[in-house]
Amino acid sequence: MKNYGIQQYFLYIMHKIIINLSGILLNNTKHNAIMNPLTSFTKTIHTKGRKIIMEALKRVSPEKAGIHSQSIIEFIQQAQAEGIELHSLMILRHGKVCEEAWWKPYDSVTPQTMFSFSKSITSTAVGFAVQEGLLSLDEKLVDIFPDETPENPGENLKAADVYSLLTMSCGQENDICYQLKSYDHWIHDFMHADFKYKPGTMFQYNSTGTDMLCAIIKKKTGLNVSEYLKPRLFDKIGMTNISCRLLPGDIEMGGSGFRVKTEDMARLGQFYLNRGIWKGERLLNEEWIDMATSRQISTVNPVFDNHDSNWQHGYGFQFWRCIPEGLYRADGAYGQFAIMDPDKDVVIAITSASFCPDRLLNIVWEKLLVGITDKEELEESGSYEQLKHLNAELAIPGLWNVRNRAHEDEWGQIRYQVSGEDVPCFADLTGGPGTWGNYGRKLSAISFEFQRTECRIHIEDEDFASDLYAGMDGTYHVSYVRGEKFAASACWEEENVLSLAVRALKTVSGTRFRITFTEKEISIRRCPLMPQTGEKFSERDWDHLVLKA
């Protein structure tokens, strides 16, 4: 870390505290964590009447951790040059944070949907259950779920066990989640699906199989995965504000439904690098850590059709092996990664909205890894100052700052009401990958107030009213709708067409709206904000609805 003078150091700490306290007060919400200064300190978290004292991770410069700042700069620049939308980056070396960055409007305190990164959390819960003697790897599904088992189960189903679920080799040719019309009886449907292959012999990606592990944890412990892990892992290593989507039966969707913060991703990775130890306390036995993170099964076969090279190096217990020898990762859709390098004692946590996660991983190998030296410490360089400046400026570009003052005054005085068919409430209209179901409410009316740097969009649902603020200064502005954090940016695309980009910050993306104003009505079209690579918004299919003045 660079040697700060006392005055500069004091100002730095006060700056961080003020920023985070201001965000908490302005957003009228409580956050469990605040951004940390460069040194370690403790913070107190109150959880259901219990007080937890959590020590923050130490902060150092990359050079103080033996990493070249220039390699981090080049990673960020290369990802951006290739159009990969990064949301956060955190690097730990020897348990210390040596790089942390968030692309505004994403931040350090908002948990984000992890998709299949969730599987590594579920796997960890299974490890604790095995350690406590509540479960064994060779325990058969037909014995755990006798009431859900077919009357005459086939030999492959009878052989399916916990190990085969952990290694994505239960024997099913396809994940039933793509075939189900309803999840009401999903455990029954899983057990009655075709188990075509002998368990343990054929890798096939199966998120419902991971959800079955959650059902097993609940059946064995009476607790959901997050409840079970809270005193055993989360509280111990400082993971806070963890949530998970529920399936019917009040069972957590551990295959894809967890939401965590970037630092919590890094903490989980460090826990695995520590081989189950945290602050000198053994939490999970190292035999499990070794099994979970080593290659248990090949991922190259005729059934698992994935030609991306980063998914062809084997699979452990819900962890992927990586192209560079010795590395493994927790891996979620659209580029939610915690990459662990045991030899270098490094964790790289990334969140993003990318349809090219394979390319994102390759940029990690090509740019980041080469800058991690075997030295404990490097001399400070001007690159660290450049990196700090780059981190401070990182942001998802908002819509181009184009105003239409004459029409803004005219149309900003009108309340547009829904007429005819029902329209989903605004939060449901926005959606985005990783949204947990719908609120099920209807939109009633909407109005616009164009201000100096933003547009206040007053949203009236049938049971709720709130304001969404969209930046009209080329940036995203953050506000709350139904208690959820949204970011929005707007500009005039044509004389009477307002373009509005809205992101639900708990998810990886959001929705692009085109709002066409006429004398007595507005016409709203929408499409996903995250198109396929190379696809233009003009080529998308847009949903359409009309509101009248």
Language-model features, listed with the residues they occupy:
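A short, well-structured edge-of-sheet supersecondary motif
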Residues: 71-107, 345-348
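Structured C-terminal helix/loop/strand segments within mature extracytoplasmic catalytic/sensor domains
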Residues: 51, 332-397
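Active-site helix/loop module of the DD-peptidase/beta-lactamase fold
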Residues: 113, 132-170, 192, 221-256, ...
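Active-site Gly/Thr loop motif
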Residues: 290-348
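Active-site-proximal alpha-helical segments within enzyme catalytic domains
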Residues: 209-216, 256-277, 289, 336-353
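Peripheral terminal and inter-domain segments
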Residues: 50, 382-549
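Short, charged, amphipathic alpha-helices and their helix-cap/turn boundaries
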Residues: 67, 96-101, 140-143, 175-199, ...
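Active-site SXXK
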Residues: 95, 112-138, 165, 213-217, ...
